[in-house]
Amino acid sequence: MIEIKDVGKIFGDTKVLENISLDIKEGEVFGIIGRSGAGKSTLLRCLNGLENYDEGSIKVMDKEVKDLNNIELRKLRKDMGMIFQGFNIMNSKNIYDNVALPLQVWKKDKKYIDEKVRELLKLVGLENKAKSYPRELSGGQKQRVAIARALTMEPKVLLCDEATSALDPETTKSILKLIQKINKELKITVVVVTHQMEVIKEICNRIALIDGRKVSAYGEVKDLFLRPEGELKKIIEQEELLPNEGVNIKLFFPSNASQQSVITSMARELNVDFSIVWGKLESFRKEVLGSLIINIEEDKKVAICEYLNKKSILWEVI
């Protein structure tokens, strides 16, 4: 659906994106993460032509974005809804009129506008707020208005630029559930830019980490978070303090393996002692995955590693 190849972007004398190559599949929720100033929001805005790119290619639904004229670009943006951290709704208009605005701009008839606005307000849980004004709403409700407005033209792609950054954790969860619902029920491809790791783990299928203008990590969320490397490991704060003596082994428990009593079985069957340094379970789109670090004596390393291989447990010496 979206093909990004060797994209570069320059502001003045500064290169902010370099050799960016990604493939975003139809129907998935794709996350773009990175530290502030990494260029992730700039990349997102290149997808719908809000920003120009200086090098490479961006094809959205088989259309090269930089080759589109103004009319073609307007049609592309019609197929790409967008929501922002700051909501961008008009305080002088009530909720109904805020959602109706794009439909009015595209000169839809009044009956269609009324039906569409009420349908979308129901979808986002604001059917009773049609006549309310933004000042009467919470931050989460304002973002729901923005989401409803972004869906008015029945887009094929929804771009989310730090859409939950201004919200409290509980409200963030409710907005993420709504985005998942939209992705599933309306079959809309979602591209999420965020610095919030919980957002990525909760709704994304795959992610790309932008660091130093380039993509430094790219793949399935659970794979990258279970075995993070480099900048991603720093971002998710997994730099751990480890014992200096013995051998430290990190175990990974994807899918059903996380439910097995591997550790107690290993201790019993091999008759070995070891220390558990730390462990945790995390949820990735409702799939529970775990990791654990154990410290063992050097002479037990071969037996334990053979046991882990036999049980098909992923592991690495760290």
Swiss-Prot record:
One of its GO terms (cellular component) is plasma membrane. SMART domains: AAA, NIL. Its EC number is 7.4.2.11. The keyword Iron does not apply. Keywords: Amino-acid transport, ATP-binding, Cell membrane, Membrane, Nucleotide-binding, Translocase, Transport. InterPro entries: AAA+_ATPase, ABC_transporter-like_ATP-bd, ABC_transporter-like_CS, ACT-like_dom_sf, MetN_ABC, MetN_ABC_transporter-like, NIL_domain, P-loop_NTPase. The complex is composed of two ATP-binding proteins (MetN), two transmembrane proteins (MetI) and a solute-binding protein (MetQ). This is Methionine import ATP-binding protein MetN. The gene is metN.
